[in-house]
């Protein structure tokens, strides 16, 4: 008797969930992390096909594609603030081994894409919409022409904010979207947001828009103790990222500009108006319990406004969920893949 995959999809997903849940780790375990990374992840990253395209203003955007065959489902990754595609080698390998092609682009002013400030260490944009326009350009010029199977979105931090704006216009192209610690509200620390916005508005008004925002710009990765990392509890993964800044200094970002802070805050304020445009899309939001960079309240509000949204708070996690210690990271990857697998059939 021939079985229909579609009719028996739930059983298959159940079996898959048991298999995923039984795994103790994914591509790389923290134990002897660097050796495993060099043996497993580095060769995989070498297999990526790199390319570049021009943004709407002629700025160069770099991207990388991990593709095995036309019929596979695919994941578009939108990276976080100050990140490059190099940060996502481990995650890309996990997705590849789970059966997905991966497309990842460096945001303008970050990674290997063109810089917009006089100082290449400054994350700067004239307006937030350029991030969204770049993502749409990447989607239409690179991703959609190649993908023949279902397409999914995985967006982290600032990429989550860009992703929400992308979905406003392009939700029809995606089966589901997973957000990791999305920047739906900037954490301005002890300074109230309205006051922080007032300060950067003043800086922009006096012609300092492309300069470091107050209190930013003094980040030195050589002085960070991996055991005291504020982005992840994983000493091994923190050390790897810090070493990456030294090995590939052109990807290093020391801080955001005044204009960047202004644009991001304004973009978060417009989020409630966007939700209705992708309200029916299956959404997963992974929330870090101890996030020092974004506030979780707006993540919960966005999820509550969506029809099919699951919010998972991961205990004992800092902002970089996909760079966390194995137990938390494995839980995050299981949740992401469960979402993607469940919606492959449409």
Model regions and ranges:
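Short beta-strand/loop motif that positions the catalytic acidic residue
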Residues: 279, 285-287, 291
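Active-site glycine-rich loops that stabilize anionic/oxyanionic intermediates
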Residues: 72, 80-83, 158
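Catalytic active-site module of serine/aspartate enzymes centered on a nucleophile-bearing elbow/loop
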Residues: 310, 315-346
């Amino acid at each position: 008797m021939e079985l229909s995959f579609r009719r028996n999809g739930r059983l298959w997903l159940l079996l898959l969930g048991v298999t995923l849940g039984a795994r103790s780790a994914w591509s790389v375990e923290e134990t002897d992390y660097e050796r495993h990374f060099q043996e497993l992840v580095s060769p995989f990253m070498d297999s990526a096909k790199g390319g570049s395209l021009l943004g709407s203003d002629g700025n160069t955007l770099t991207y990388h594609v991990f593709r095995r065959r036309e019929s596979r489902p695919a994941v578009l990754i939108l990276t976080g603030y100050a990140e490059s595609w190099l940060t996502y080698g481990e995650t890309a390998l996990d997705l590849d081994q789970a059966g997905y092609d991966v497309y990842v682009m460096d945001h303008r002013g970050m990674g290997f894409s063109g810089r917009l400030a006089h100082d290449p260490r400054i994350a700067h944009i004239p307006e937030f919409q350029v991030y969204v326009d770049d993502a749409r350009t990447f989607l239409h010029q690179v991703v959609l022409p190649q993908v023949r199977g279902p397409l999914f979105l995985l967006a982290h931090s600032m990429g989550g904010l860009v992703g929400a704006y992308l979905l406003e216009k392009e939700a029809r192209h995606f089966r589901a979207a997973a957000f990791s610690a999305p920047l739906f509200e900037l954490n301005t620390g002890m300074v109230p947001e309205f006051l922080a916005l007032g300060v950067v508005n003043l800086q922009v008004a006096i012609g300092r828009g492309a300069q470091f925002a107050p209190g930013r710009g003094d980040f030195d990765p050589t002085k960070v103790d991996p055991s005291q990392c504020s982005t992840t509890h994983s000493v091994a993964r923190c050390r790897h990222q810090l070493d990456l800044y030294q090995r590939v200094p052109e990807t290093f970002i020391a801080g955001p500009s005044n204009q960047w802070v202004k644009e991001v805050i304004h973009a978060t304020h417009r989020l409630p108006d966007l939700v209705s445009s992708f309200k029916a899309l299956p959404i997963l939001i992974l929330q870090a319990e101890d996030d020092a960079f974004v506030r979780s309240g707006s993540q919960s509000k966005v999820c509550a406004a969506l029809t099919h949204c699951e919010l998972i708070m991961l205990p004992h996690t800092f902002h970089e969920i996909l760079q966390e210690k194995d137990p938390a990271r494995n839980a995050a990857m299981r949740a992401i893949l469960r979402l993607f697998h469940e919606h492959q059939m449409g």
